[in-house]
Amino acid sequence: AQGIRSEDALSRGIKIKRMTSSNPYRIPGLELIDHTFEVPLDHGNPGGRKINVFVREVCDLDPKSKDKPFLLFLQGGPGFRAPLPIRKEGWLKRALTEFRVLMYDTRGNGLSSAVDYQALVLEGDARAQADYLKHFRQDNIVRDAEAIRAEMSPDTPWSTIGQSYGGWCTMTYLSLHPEGLKECFIFGGVPGLDRTAREIYEGTFPFVEERNRQYFEKFPMDKERLVKLARHLQENDVRFPNGDRVIPQLVQLLGLKFGFAHTAEEIHFLLEEAFVQAGDQEIVSHTFKMGLQAALRFDTNPIFAILHEAIYAQGSASAWACDAVQKESYPHFNNFEDFLFYGEMVFPWMFDEISELKGMKEAANILADYDGWPALYDKDVLSRNTVPVACAVYANDMFVNARFSRETIESVPNMKAFYTSEYEHCGLRVGGEHLFSRLIDLGRGEVER
């Protein structure tokens, strides 16, 4: 793979431009300042095209907050904006006792030159679209972040907190610009440094099968419901309000919820309302169609689909890895007489069935075939890591293989882990203040594990 440490604008001494910073404004318990920066689309060509990157600064109402150091939040995904600071609670409440928190909309998301089909078609043909999207992985997310740090905190490294894919970004940050980091906290997101997309899915499918077993053990009545629903959708032209056809495979994608606490119950209660009586026949209910559509975030968060496998690619093509593993080793997932849910998985057929993705199909195939992806981690730099990194690793995490996480943690100095089966992938949201406090203590040596 092409090396990660390619020259960027920052290494050339070229500063980015802060376009705007709002006046402080308040919501209950919080003061917010919105910042927008202009950064190079390609950090290797700082004089070329620019995009915007948005960061929301969040402080408590203590007048001394402006003197607190920064904590940069790296969001999960890929393809999601930073959390919206609605109220002072959970991990944010703990963070604000000693930090100014920066909610960072990574490039392509939220208010940071968001990628959607309406914008992407303006890039030109499928090749131009794919070339544009190649710039939206974690390496450039990190380059943006470090350039912003050089502007907002030029003399002081900052701390980071990474949720899920935010941990991928953290490990890339430690590879590219460790000098910008004081300490890092990772929740359910330590990647295997050398693991390919294919290896990821070979490890994921057994977890998903087990979650299916647990689900149908808890809700045995749902097997018959799902088989009935799948047959109905195969035999009838059922449509979402936006005109997309409702197919059984989209129902299978509800299994994404298995990776979060208490969300299997949400699936069960949604299935209760799958049908409604219309005269002398049953039809799929509007309630179910709207619930299913709301659960599938691919239409509003297309990066989650189009770059999902690319976050593992380093010098090789992702090649629709999940689809290949499913067809070769788990063909029974296609048998609707024995209905099984998928997990966090992306398939090429989605680009035929989901409106917002249809126009990205050619670009998605180009990206899946692309084998020139540069490296995302520098194992030599990581082998000499001096930045304290504290991680929460969830033993039963359906999204991030704990065995792969352990491989990385054991190979990188100054990484400490709290291994637990108490939380699912959403531990930061559920464990909040308590779990973040535990990782702070772990990272700073107050506790051993």
Residue map of PLM features:
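Hydrophobic, well-ordered secondary-structure elements that form the walls
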Residues: 55, 394, 408
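Eukaryotic N-terminal low-complexity, Ser/Thr- and Lys/Arg-rich leader segments
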Residues: 1-8
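Alpha-helix boundary/capping residues
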Residues: 274, 412-415
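Short alpha-helix in the alpha/beta-hydrolase fold that links the catalytic acid
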Residues: 270-272, 401-408
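Gly/Pro-rich cap/lid or specificity-loop segments adjacent to the active site
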Residues: 10-242, 349, 356-364, 374-382, ...
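C-terminal structured domains
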Residues: 391, 409-413
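Alpha/beta-hydrolase fold active-site neighborhood
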Residues: 237-370
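Conserved strand-to-loop "acid loop" that flanks and positions the catalytic carboxylate
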Residues: 390-396
